[in-house]
Amino acid sequence: MKEINPKDTTRAYAFEMWMQAPNPMVTFFKTLDVSRIVRISRRKGLKLNMLMCYCIGRAATQVKEFYMLPVGGKLMKFDTIAVNTIVANSAGEVSSCDLPFSDDFAQFGSDYLRLTKQVADSCVDHDLSSESMVVGTSALAQYEIDGAVGMYSGIFNNPFMIWGKYKRGLFKTTLAISFLFHHTQMDGAHAAKFLDILQREIKNLKA
């Protein structure tokens, strides 16, 4: 992670307009067709949350704005992406686990299992925010929700995605997601592009 001059980037105007806004976060809603990864999860015994996190990481690496993030009033540049997941720990509470994104599916899956177990057992968060731009996620897989807004803490500016229980239809299985992002980091067009790429990655996942 290193500081960059906003004026030397495509985010110069956004930094000036949105950095000091009372609430600079924007939320998009989208319904994804997750039929393919639900089938893969069932047939291969892979965790659906891991498959979602992998596809999110794949999509994020294809949008250059994900490699920049406003942190502490400055614009920072990152070389790598990580995907965060929330883990139920051994104390009956939850812990945070940052997963380094690897395009190698087997490597990402191995890291997912190892790190989530480590965090669950130790009750100690695994934090990569000083070295990677972290995409936050929260899966409320037991509950039916239509979306979530108002997740801005004023401290963390990271993009964040939340979803609930998927819905089975006659021809496809769908998942409603909310995607929260800081307007300094990206514009609506970048966020929409990311969500379109995410849908494509889900439909084309080879595992």
Which residues make up each language-model segment?
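Conserved GHKL (Bergerat-fold) ATPase module
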Residues: 2-3, 21, 81, 113-117, ...
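Gly/Ser/Thr-rich phosphate-binding loops and adjoining beta-strand/alpha-helix segments
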Residues: 4, 19-51, 67-83, 135-137, ...
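Intrinsically disordered, low-complexity linker/assembly segments
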Residues: 148-180, 184-186, 194-196
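Acyl activation and transfer enzymes in specialized metabolism, enriched
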Residues: 37-62, 175-194
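Helical lid/core segments from catalytic subdomains that handle acyl or acyl-like groups
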Residues: 89-145
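Short alpha-helical functional segments enriched in proximate histidine and acidic residues
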Residues: 59-66, 201, 205
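Plant-skewed but cross-kingdom recognition/interaction modules and surfaces
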Residues: 115-123, 127, 161-162, 178-181, ...
